[in-house]
Amino acid sequence: MNNIAKFQPMNHQHKVIKIISIVAGIILISVILIILLISPIAKYIIEKNDINFTGRHITMGSVTINPFTGYVHISNLKIYEYRSDSIFISAGDARAHFAMLKLLNKTVEISNLTLDKFWGVVDKNNMEFNFNDVIRKFTPKKTDSKKPATIHFNILNIKINDGIIYYREKLVPINYFIKNAAIECTGKQWNSDSLDVKYSFLSGPRQGSMNGIFSMNVKNLNYRIEVIAHQFDLEILEPYIRNSKKYGTYSANLEANLKAKGNFRDASDVTFTGMLAINKFHFGKNQKTDVGSFEKLQLSIYQLCPKDNKYLFDSVSITHPFFKLERYDHSDNLTEMFGKKGSKVRGNSTSGNFNLITTIGNYIAALSKNFFRSDYKINRLAIYNGDFMYNDYSLSEKFAVEIHPVNVLSDSIDKTNDRVNIYFSSNIKPSGTLKVALSINPKDSGDFDLNYSLQRIPATLFNPYLIFYTSYPLNRGIIEMKGQWTVRNGIIKSNNHLEVIDPRLDKRVQNKDTKRLPMPLIMAILRDNGNVIDYRIPITGKLKNPTFHLNDVIRDALVNIIVKPVTTPYRLLVKNVETDIEKSLTLKWEMNQRNPDDHQEQFITKMADFLKKNPEASIRVQPHIYFQKEKEYIQLFEAKKKFYLALHHKNESEFGATETEAVEKMSIKDTLFMEYLNKHIKSKLIFTVQDKCALLIPSANINKKLTLLKKERENEFLQVFNKKGVEKQVAFTKAIKGIPFNGYSFYRITYKGVLPKALIAAYREMNHLNNEAPRKEYKADRRKARN
């Protein structure tokens, strides 16, 4: 009995241990089963009910869930577009930790979420985004009774690694993406309004990188941004620009180290500091043809705060800006690109569709609208090496002028200063300079002093206009103009001095494109005895309604009418001496002229005879070729010739002197000729007759004819010297291409050794005339013009 009593406690203890072991085993097995089964079960439930839960189809690779630690891992996660087989977002690996203990406090918290090899797309169609359905599904429905939320949600420490994110817009259209995206977000707690994001990524299609931080208070919409960009390609803007133009290409990249803070509710409530630069900006007909461009536009900002009326810059500069304006028969290059008066741009901005370019433009306008009424300061404002071109194709000949290099400089543009000084200087191609000095009151734009100087402009530059409107070109002349303006309270007091030194008309051009004015009579009235047009034209009155005082012009015209007949012998003497010198030193070639005329033959013969008599003497001949004009003339002639032969059913062998004269007099605006060009040149982006002719007649053919023309002129010139046996005393030097002083190609002749007596006599006579009235007054100007 004692033994039985002794074993009963032991059996009871054994049973307890056994029960505990069984329970522990069951629990352990259950835990193992839960760990083993919860992952596939969760995957099955999610994929089975994905559309019911989210409205989206979801697929996953492997799923690992630890319900005890809250760890979740999903591989090859893919969430598809709404009712589509296209992927919305995907991740090679998605990892998350849930704070399991906080579930006891009715708080669902994802303590960290990491998405590796992330891929996503934001798609916009009109005003609808591809994630709007998700927002609508998870947005609580409004009820009459407002009950406090019983379950709170936190999501913290979000990371995206090695991401690719696309932005697509069907209406524009646009398809842009960024790559190597690394995004870190502190996340959002249910009882916190702050959101902090750190980001970095590369431009997808092209070069460039961007990184920075973004912080925001989601309740009051205050924000803080830091952006560092390095050569970040701005291709994303190209589709929006494409919507604002008829044709053309665009490119640029961004350099920035910028900080900003403000509030999203008020565009003016923002403060910028740092540096912003746009590099290698190009806009043009194609990648090789610019309409507008610049190497670099840089803003260095101390403080820009429109709300506090502060615009403080260390420097604002633009390097190598370029702009080309072209005028056509009925429009210009800007009208062709952007519509009449920018209608293409305005139509796009008022269509109701989002356009990033117009949005940025409107934002900049909002930021800068109170600039001149605010406290502003720019320590240095500069334009370096600018280049501005103007081409006019509406005339019978192309007019072209270029202002380069343009340099504008101003130090300390400050509203607190009494005056702000701005200096402008540039060369004018083919010849000349322009200088402007402006001193302005920063508090009053109607209070300024202006001095300008326009010097050494060849009058022959304007021959296309003179031929078109008068039929008379000039073959010499220098234009200069100076002025001093003083403006106080919007009232002008200015002196302007115009000089045209030695202007001289050439023979009349006869073709159907030109109008006719009695230019010899007009020049006789305008030009004084010193062979100079010299007028002082004061301007007074209000800036918006100035008065031009033409007393000097009228007085000189009346004097010339009375005096000119009496002084005709003097003027003829001057003209004859100038002609003797000019003909001794130059040989002018008309457009497409191959053989010297009779007078030129006589001149060449005299030179050859002079060299024959003076074996120690020699001449050097330097061709000055008006290459652009010669090429344009040949292109137009050959195109008109091709049209003429087709119109009259003739071949090349039937084209003689009569046909040549008819083609030369034919207008390049001739209706039938224009129809012929348009029939053969199908492109709607070729706007000028010159460009159409260049496509009709291959450039290689034109260059061959130019080379042949140059060689024929040289051979014809040397023919007389060869006959006289003095060809070794004649040397040709390298040709100069450009716009010659007389508006024509010519040979410049330099004598070495002995000078011809007639030339010496002409020089002496001209020096004598230049040292006496009325030419003495302009002696210095003539010397400067020659230089």
Feature locations, PLM:
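Interface amphipathic segments
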Residues: L103-V108, I174-S251, D290-G292, P306-Y363, ...
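Buried hydrophobic packing residues in well-ordered domains
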Residues: D50, I74, A94, L113, ...
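Bacterial Sec-dependent N-terminal signal peptides
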Residues: M1-F53, A785
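Terminal hydrophobic membrane-targeting helix
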Residues: S30-N126, I155, I183, K188-S192, ...
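Solvent-exposed beta-strand/coil patches in large extracellular/periplasmic or lumenal scaffold regions
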Residues: K137-L171, S194-L202, N263, K340-H497, ...
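Soluble periplasmic/extracytoplasmic beta-strand elements of cell-envelope proteins
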Residues: H73-N76, S90-R95, N112-T114, K159, ...
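Secondary-structure transition motifs
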Residues: F7, N76-C185, A267, F283-P405, ...
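Extended terminal
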Residues: F7-V23, L304-N309, D314, K369-Y376, ...
